[in-house]
Swiss-Prot record:
Organism: Methanosarcina barkeri (strain Fusaro / DSM 804)
Family: Belongs to the FrhG family.
E.C. designation(s): 1.12.98.1
Keyword Oxidoreductase part of the UniProt annotation: yes
Record's protein name: Coenzyme F420 hydrogenase subunit gamma
Gene: frhG
């Protein structure tokens, strides 16, 4: 590949589980870094003090309002990035950090946390606690094709990313209640159980073929809403499903035998 894009990982208040999920791509991650992207910022992996110019910023974690450096960092990330991706449910919806009230070690004064979309404009949401390695990998490949691919590749990349861009436009709330209002109560649920399978705390069970949520267990991560095939209807993606999978597979295979 002639033109590699610049990708950065910006860590806010989170557990680093999303970065671990990214690393779980193993050879797929190496392939992306070899051929498609330069990792120009990542506090966990690289000694870079200041946020640089980036094509794609993967932001993990919510923003602590009492940590003024974090507030400035997220604003700086928006200024210096072409595409900002909320990586994981803490960045998308606040997740379990919404329940923080301060008093914890080592920063007892840190008591208020917001999803990044409450402070800046976000282009793409990747919900999940954590998101699957495959989803993160696919978004990275599609971001490259959107910025550096030919016209056909850019069109397919746009169609693939559209549902995740629509999630970003929807807002910063995500819980089983949204699934209940938008899907179940509208008669759209087909009882597939994907929402229950995606819940990281097992707050959703299937009762008589329909999902039932335990509000006391829900951590507001939005994984169920993002995973539900009926939470959005994207007629652009469905006819292109095979082409999109093929273009991702080809991108990851290309150049494997160049040694």
């Amino acid at each position: 590949m002639t033109n590699k894009i610049k990708i950065g990982h910006v860590h806010m208040s989170g557990c680093t589980g999303c970065l671990v999920s990214l690393a779980d791509n193993n050879l797929g991650l190496i392939k992306i870094l070899d051929d498609y992207a330069d990792l120009v910022y990542c506090l966990t992996l690289a000694d870079v003090r200041h946020i640089p110019e980036m094509d794609v910023a993967l932001v993990e974690g919510s923003v602590c309002l009492q940590d003024h450096e974090s507030v400035e960092d997220i604003k700086e990330t928006r200024k210096k990035s072409k595409i900002v991706v909320a990586l994981g449910s803490c960045a998308c919806y606040g997740n379990i950090t919404r329940f923080s009230r301060g008093g914890q070690h080592n920063q007892p004064q840190h008591e208020s946390y917001l999803p990044i979309g409450d402070l800046i404009d976000v282009d793409v949401y990747i919900p999940g606690c954590p998101p699957s390695p495959e989803l993160i990998r696919n978004v990275a490949v599609m971001a490259y094709l959107l910025l550096e691919g030919n016209e056909e590749q850019k069109e397919l990349a746009g169609k693939y990313l559209k549902p995740l861009m629509d999630l970003a436009k929807r807002g910063t709330s995500g819980c089983f209640c949204d699934l209940m209002y938008d899907v179940i109560n509208q008669g759209l649920c087909m009882g597939c159980g994907t929402c229950a399978a995606s819940c990281p705390v097992h707050a959703i069970t299937l009762e008589f073929g329909k999902p039932q949520g335990e509000r006391d267990l829900c951590i507001k991560c939005g994984s169920c809403y993002g995973a539900c095939p009926r939470s959005f209807f994207n007629l652009d993606v469905i006819p292109e499903f095979e082409n999109i999978n093929e273009i991702i597979a080809n991108a990851l295979k290309e150049g494997e035998s160049d040694d």
